[in-house]
Design a protein with these regions (language model features):
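N-terminal pre-Walker A segment at the start of P-loop NTPase domains
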Residues: 1-17
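Conserved lysine of the Walker
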Residues: 38
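P-loop (Walker A) phosphate-binding loop of NTP-binding proteins
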Residues: 33
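Short phosphate-coordinating micro-motif centered on Lys-Gly-acidic
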Residues: 1, 84, 92-146
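Hydrophobic anchor at the beta1->P-loop junction of P-loop NTPases
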Residues: 28-30
């Protein structure tokens, strides 16, 4: 599934659409270059999950847990060395929605069943390409495609 996003509001709106469909145990991986809109999309997800207040980038904290209709774990692995251990970050929790920016730093340690949102610059906007690995997130992607 692809979506063209004309501006940051469209990126946040896609995040809200995704967030409205998420349930505990879902894992969403956000990929894209610096400035691609990962954190903007994450903020949209957070709003749809009922997170109030500021949703900062977790770049320096690595993981920030937010309270909402379900807990949201928002992680940013950018500062980690590739392959660095992440077992103690709680990214395998099934009682929360897990949202990971820069998952390529340690993809092998993340849940195998997940949704990927790849953001790319298109000059006058962005393109979001969504794909799922595993049956649970394939069902999520099918629901988002309707």
């Amino acid at each position: 599934m692809h979506r063209d996003l004309e501006d940051s509001e469209a990126t946040a709106a896609l995040g809200r659409t995704i967030g409205a469909a998420l349930e505990p145990g879902h894992c969403v991986l956000l990929t894209g270059d610096l400035g691609a809109g990962k954190t903007t999309l994450a903020r949209g997800v957070a709003r749809a999950l009922g997170v109030a207040g500021v949703v900062p980038s977790p770049t320096f904290a690595l993981v920030i847990e937010h309270a909402g209709r379900v807990p949201l774990l928002h992680a940013d692995l950018y500062r980690l060395d590739p392959g660095a251990p992440i077992d103690d970050l709680g990214l395998d929790r099934d009682d929360a929605v897990v949202l990971v920016e820069w998952p390529d730093r340690n993809l092998g340690a993340l849940p195998a069943d997940h949704l990927v949102v790849a953001l790319t610059d298109q000059g006058q906007g962005r393109r979001a390409a969504l794909h799922a690995t595993g049956p649970r997130h394939a069902a999520l992607l099918a629901a988002l495609s309707r």
